[in-house]
Amino acid sequence: MRRAIVAFVLLVCCYTLGQQSNPPRQRVEKTPPATTPPAQTPTEQPPQTQEPRTARTPQTEQTPAQTTPQRTPESSEGAEGQQLRAMHFDMAEVPPVITHHSIRVAGRELRYTATAGRMPIKDAEGKIDAEMFYVAYTVDGSDPSSRPLTFSFNGGPGSASIWLHMGAMGPRKVVLQPQGWMPAAPYRLEDNPNTPLDKTDIVMVDAIGTGWSRPADTAAARRFWNMRGDIESFGEFIRMYLTRNERWSSPLYLFGESYGTTRSAGIAGYLADRGISFNGIVLLSTVLSFETLEFAKTNDVPFPLILPTFTWIAGYHHKLPSDLQGDVAKAAQEARDWAQGEYWAALNKGDAMSPQEHANVLDKLSRYTGLSKEIIEWANLRVDVRTFTHYLLADQKLHVGRLDGRYTGPDPNGFMDTPFYDPTSSQTGPPFTSVFNDYVRRELNYKTDMPYWTSAQQSGNFRWSWT
């Protein structure tokens, strides 16, 4: 199931960013079929028992000054000709906050230090153009010359690192309900027994314009809200962190997710030219070729690639035929083999397919996706993410999660065409945001009046350029 989730995150996260910043060719909307597919088995989700726990009181060494954003009335031209509202943020440099904690991982207790702060990113003249928020976790008593150090971030572009931070990498994580649904407030934290902190020190970094990372002004935002500027800002952050924390001799790693994998590739090349090389790079939900993500009339590449993921998710929701449902992993491999051969060849033929070939493809797609033949015919044998998530459980008036296909949310209109939304974001956003804001203030003792932007879109000013 992990491979399915990873693949689905790869596809949909970057499909979203592509639509936002570099939209593909216009798609002609079609009216979906009015009839409903045969009823299927109700959704089931495996239990994942988690117990909440109370927050701990850290040992505090420093407290940062309060940092309040300010805005000015000017405006400036943004990326790709779009208008950016004028903005200005206080770039006063404040010492980071240091607290001490412990956690039990893999049967042994780890004592570690958490450092939260904002790293200045300067221009060629030494002026601070931005500050990047980070939280570093370092195990006490280790030798920096041999202790691995991993820099980790989410993608977007325009996503904060909160999702990896509080869901996978950090020593503390958000408590969700066993079925993965959003729990009722107050939301809780618990120790993360799967944190890689026993293997490597971790630095979680927020991209400029996300989290508490801010550009100095509108001109600085234009400098960083593009691929080149984004890579340069992370490269400079890493150089500064190694310098200020005397970690130049440590084994270095990058851990990026979705667009963060593209960023990782860029950072590796950028820093190699400046004398910094990495021992390894971890790519989660990899996107290094954007053609694999662009669902468009003139691009058939994504459709065979996504099919095994659809099979995994359909199996999770018990939507596969009985002969496939018993072994979903085997079914996904069968779908992969068919997609790379017969399906790909059929798409290449297009209208040259014989009626029998068309019927065979229709049968197989229905078999591997759990969708009705009518829906697949309407989609012209090309099922994209929006079609799949909207129609898989439409007979139950449920919508499947986009970022995580295990999630579902109510869709009262059922088979009627409705605005697209993602139950995953709806159910994880509030717990993650609330818990993180409480965690950094109470356990890490980091104080600020600024809002934490989980997405740069929350700035109301985000314009991304792919140059």
Predicted region positions:
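Alpha/beta-hydrolase fold nucleophile elbow
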Residues: 246-259
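A catalytic-pocket lid/entrance helix-loop region that shapes and gates access to the active site
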Residues: 171-176, 269-373
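Compositionally biased, proline/threonine/alanine/serine-rich low-complexity intrinsically disordered stretches
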Residues: 17-91
